[in-house]
Amino acid sequence: MAIITLVGEKLAKPGVEFIFYGPAEPCKTCKLAGVCVGNLEPGRRYKILRVRSMPSHSCPLHEGKVRVVEVVEPSIEVAIEPRLAVVGSVITLKLEDCPDLDKRDLFKPEGLFDGDSVKIIEITGEVECNGKTYKIAKVMRKKE
């Protein structure tokens, strides 16, 4: 289900993904904070589905203007234990440690947290780290 929020005019395009890091200081007193940052969860990745055809709103953070958009949490690729890699299953995510910085996005992907409940959508490959082979799974977070 889509979430309604506000994003800067320059980002307001279908398909654009962003990470919400939490509200900035000026947001705390803004009258639009409820719809803008109130519907988003800090640390999560969002993808813009649709830009609503409504007037833009003033914002001191986004070069003056924000637009109303519909967003969803997209699927994210993550390295998981091979024994857990069953398409369609729901697992509790255990993010593995990997010292290889080039593989960080697979082992600690932004938008997912250790302990998240996720559904495995697809297995897209394999990755090695510390002499161990992991499956690369495309997952969707299951909300409580």
UniProtKB/Swiss-Prot annotation:
What is the protein named?
UPF0179 protein TK0790
Organism phylogeny: Archaea, Methanobacteriati, Methanobacteriota, Thermococci, Thermococcales
Q: Which InterPro entries match?
A: UPF0179
Q: Which family does it belong to?
A: Belongs to the UPF0179 family.
Native organism: Thermococcus kodakarensis (strain ATCC BAA-918 / JCM 12380 / KOD1) (Pyrococcus kodakaraensis (strain KOD1))
